[in-house]
Amino acid sequence: MYRIEADRFILEFFPEIHEQDFAYPVNVYLGVKVSSYGYSADTFMDVGVQGIAEFALQLKNLYETLSGEARLEEPYSVHNYLEFVAETGGHIRVMGRLNNKSAFGYTQEINFENEIDQTYLRDFVNLLLADFGRYAE
């Protein structure tokens, strides 16, 4: 599990890697939980190991330079996404759209935005890179 927990914001990743699908762009079932100011979602994203690796590298650059952005988005389906954008003063804006893809016959969707201090990224980024860095192109 990969987790960021700050005041009024929690983001968790639960990846299931499907090595037999490495020839395809989507090979990770990424469980995602988010809670932002009391609004929450528990869903999944269909992404690839290379997409997560690139996202982790973007996050590392954002953390180290306090500039730029990092985005993880599904290549297909409803295009769920998570985005981190550097702001002034060492703050990081975290936003995204998560849709449950009509699980259980009903559509649920959350659009969220929050802000965290850069220090909350360090462990999250290091864990992602340790596990997914080898998949970077």
Feature-to-residue mapping (PLM):
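DNA polymerase processivity clamps
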Residues: 21, 64-88, 136
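Mixed-charge, glycine-accented linear interaction segment located at domain edges/termini
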Residues: 101-137
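Intrinsic, low-complexity N-terminal interaction/targeting segments
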Residues: 22-29, 79-104
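Charged, alpha-helix-forming regions
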Residues: 1-21, 28-36, 41, 45, ...
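Charged, amphipathic alpha-helical segments
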Residues: 5-17, 59-67, 76-79
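Short, well-structured hydrophobic secondary-structure segments
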Residues: 31-67
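Short acidic/polar mixed-charge low-complexity motifs
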Residues: 9, 37-41, 78, 90, ...
